[in-house]
């Protein structure tokens, strides 16, 4: 394809993004230099307000994968992606009401500390290793996506832009810690929205108005959103997105270190919940912008598809190619779009680096060397940020082999996030599950999700389940037009038509449900965990969310865990005292090899006023 070059103003706009992002890191490095503690560096001293945290949460997972991948997906497969509107709502409600209260009230820094408190160290370490692998792989995809966009629209060296992204993210993460990451994310979120709106306004104007865009999309069957086919092999249906998508995104939001780390950095639990709910508005806005961008792109290319005509070589190049055509006579605006794509990437990569440094320090370094000074702890945390910045940037090389960025990213989250969601669900929702069941469940979930995902990579799903909607090249007028036809599949085993053909959104469903089922069964076979041995702040049965269930049923769900639901409101009103007490209890628990086996409700280290205030729901 012909490479269209940036004008001077495009470079100015694009460079401004990097300069401002780096400047925020320098600002917080100088401002917080006298607060040299690992707590301040990793969780912002737990004094953040909900506004910037909400923007940061949205920016962290609405990356260049969303900016480039979602419009391309809508262009090829239709607007069914908008059903994630429902998915996001369910995920945020479950996260804020089910998972967040447990993590926030436990006083933890790493979500995997919870697993040691609830089960033991082996479970904690196994989960931490899986999270590290998952995050490094996902970050590689996120770094590669905007680098590809920049390469296509400017001819700028692909790997040069990859390393530029990694260097800037690592720079402000290492200097400024979580506060720098959160405030930089907030700035980048604004850039993302402005970039999307610019494309939508100019694109719909060029197409003759929004009404004409929707009419063209309807004629091209792009608005057939509500497909209620229950076949789990279909790539995107109402049920695939609402069920499989919920499991996938709950793994991202409900138990993911990057999300929870921001929530527990808030000054109160109320602020943490507000951050999640305001973040939901951001998710919806970005989703709608991305979907309408895809529809606008279809209205523009409906008679000459650049992908099947051979003008571009991959679907993820559609959006940058569209932008360069749209703004070819408007210097600065192509640079704004690329800044939009890079904003999503910078925020996601920074969040990943910060989260990786946190879990590595808390789960490995601190547990091995508990007497480190604050100054040394801070320097080690910064060193870990630098190390993971290098690793994540290097992993982007492998991302070029993964195909479409949106499917690759969500597949990675599904393969690892589903079993992790199942593991935390076992700990929080099922008081009777023991550490043997938890560990066996995690391994079972990982094996199942990787089995189906790797099988799908080797034996791609049949074209009838994944082939795009019709695309036209009638008015391209090119001699090298190629017609896109379904690939001819060689001899395939029967399992490739069923198990391996499962929608990528169900990888998380398989991993989570497999983990829970195995965990419950193994716990029954090896001896159930005694409820009286578990501190009640580590448990939150689903029955606790519904006031209409009888007291007898609620007592049954708690499985013998000693608690007093009557003081829950008092706990929320005394949040600061409660949080301090929780952290004290946390340290008592982490000093033991495993809190649960040796827990004694009569022990003086647990029986104090602070704990009485924090351990009731």
UniProtKB/Swiss-Prot annotation:
Keyword Oxidoreductase annotated: no
Reaction(s) this enzyme catalyzes, per UniProt: (S)-lactate(out) + Na(+)(out) = (S)-lactate(in) + Na(+)(in); nicotinate(out) + Na(+)(out) = nicotinate(in) + Na(+)(in); pyruvate(out) + Na(+)(out) = pyruvate(in) + Na(+)(in); propanoate(out) + Na(+)(out) = propanoate(in) + Na(+)(in)
Function, in words: Acts as an electroneutral and low-affinity sodium (Na(+))-dependent sodium-coupled solute transporter. Catalyzes the transport across the plasma membrane of many monocarboxylates such as lactate, pyruvate, nicotinate, propionate, butyrate and beta-D-hydroxybutyrate. May be responsible for the first step of reabsorption of monocarboxylates from the lumen of the proximal tubule of the kidney and the small intestine. May play also a role in monocarboxylates transport in the retina. Mediates electroneutral uptake of lactate, with a stoichiometry of 2 Na(+) for each lactate.
Family, similarity comment: Belongs to the sodium:solute symporter (SSF) (TC 2.A.21) family.
Gene source species: Bos taurus
Record keyword Signal present: no
Domain of life: Eukaryota
Keywords: Cell membrane, Glycoprotein, Ion transport, Membrane, Sodium, Sodium transport, Symport, Transmembrane, Transmembrane helix, Transport
Subcellular location: Apical cell membrane
TM region positions: 6-26, 48-68, 81-101, 129-149, 158-178, 181-201, 236-256, 274-294, 335-357, 386-406, 412-432, 438-458, 508-528
Residue numbers on the Extracellular membrane side: 1-5, 69-80, 150-157, 202-235, 295-334, 407-411, 459-507
Stated name of the protein: Sodium-coupled monocarboxylate transporter 2
Glycosylation-annotated residues: 219, 480
Molecular function GO terms recorded: lactate transmembrane transporter activity; monocarboxylate:sodium symporter activity; symporter activity
């Amino acid at each position: 394809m012909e490479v269209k070059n940036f004008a001077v103003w495009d470079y100015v706009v694009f460079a401004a993004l990097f300069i401002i992002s780096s400047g925020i890191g320098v600002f917080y490095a100088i401002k917080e230099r006298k607060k040299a503690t690992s707590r301040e560096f990793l969780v912002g001293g737990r004094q953040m307000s909900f506004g910037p945290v909400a923007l940061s949460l949205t920016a962290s997972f609405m990356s260049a994968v969303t900016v480039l991948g979602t419009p391309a997906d809508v262009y090829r497969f239709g607007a069914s992606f908008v059903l994630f509107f429902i998915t996001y709502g369910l995920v945020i409600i479950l996260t804020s009401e089910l998972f967040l209260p447990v993590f926030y009230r436990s006083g933890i820094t790493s979500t995997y500390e919870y697993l040691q408190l609830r089960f033991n160290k082996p479970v904690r370490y196994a989960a931490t290793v899986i999270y590290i692998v998952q995050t490094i792989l996902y970050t590689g995809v996120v770094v590669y996506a905007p680098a590809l966009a920049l390469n296509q629209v400017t001819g700028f060296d692909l790997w040069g832009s990859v390393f530029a992204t990694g260097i800037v993210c690592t720079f402000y993460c290492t200097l400024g810690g979580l506060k720098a990451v959160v405030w930089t994310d907030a700035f980048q979120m604004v850039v993302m929205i402005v970039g999307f709106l610019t494309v939508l306004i100019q694109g719909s104007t060029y197409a003759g108005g929004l009404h004409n865009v929707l009419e063209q999309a309807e004629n091209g069957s792009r608005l057939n959103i509500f497909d209620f086919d229950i076949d789990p092999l279909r790539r995107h249906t109402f049920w695939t997105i609402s069920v499989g998508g919920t499991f996938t995104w709950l793994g991202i939001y409900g138990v993911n270190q990057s999300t929870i780390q921001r929530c527990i950095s808030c000054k109160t639990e109320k602020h943490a919940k507000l951050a999640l709910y305001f973040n939901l508005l951001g998710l919806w806005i970005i989703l709608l912008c991305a979907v309408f961008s895809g529809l606008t792109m279809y209205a523009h290319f409906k008679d000459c598809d650049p992908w099947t005509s051979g003008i571009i070589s991959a679907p993820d190049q559609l959006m940058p190619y569209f932008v360069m055509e749209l703004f070819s006579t408007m210097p600065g605006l192509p640079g704004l779009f690329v800044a939009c794509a890079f904003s999503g990437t910078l925020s996601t990569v920074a969040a990943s680096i910060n989260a990786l440094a946190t879990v590595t320090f808390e789960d490995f370094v601190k547990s091995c060397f508990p007497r480190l000074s604050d100054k040394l702890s801070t320097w080690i945390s910064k060193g870990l940020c630098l190390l993971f910045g290098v690793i994540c940037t290097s992993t982007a090389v492998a991302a070029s082999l993964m195909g479409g960025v949106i499917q690759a990213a969500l597949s990675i989250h599904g393969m690892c996030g589903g079993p992790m969601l199942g593991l935390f669900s076992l700990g929080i929702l099922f008081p009777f599950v023991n550490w043997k069941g938890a560990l066996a469940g995690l391994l079972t979930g990982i094996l199942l999700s990787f089995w189906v995902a790797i099988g799908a990579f080797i034996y791609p799903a049949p074209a009838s389940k994944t082939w795009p909607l019709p695309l036209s090249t009638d008015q391209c007028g090119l001699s090298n037009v190629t017609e896109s036809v379904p690939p001819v599949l060689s001899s395939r085993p029967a399992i490739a038509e069923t198990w391996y053909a499962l929608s990528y959104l169900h990888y998380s469903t398989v991993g989570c449900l497999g983990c829970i089922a195995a965990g419950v069964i193994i716990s029954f076979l090896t001896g159930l965990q005694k409820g009286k041995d578990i501190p009640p702040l580590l448990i939150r049965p689903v029955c606790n969310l519904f006031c209409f269930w009888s007291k007898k049923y609620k007592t049954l769900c708690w499985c013998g865990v000693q608690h007093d639901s009557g003081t829950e409101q008092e706990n929320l009103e005394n949040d600061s005292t409660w949080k301090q007490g929780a952290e004290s209890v946390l340290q008592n628990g982490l000093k033991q090899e495993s809190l649960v086996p040796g827990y004694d409700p009569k022990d003086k280290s647990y029986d104090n006023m602070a704990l009485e205030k924090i351990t009731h729901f």
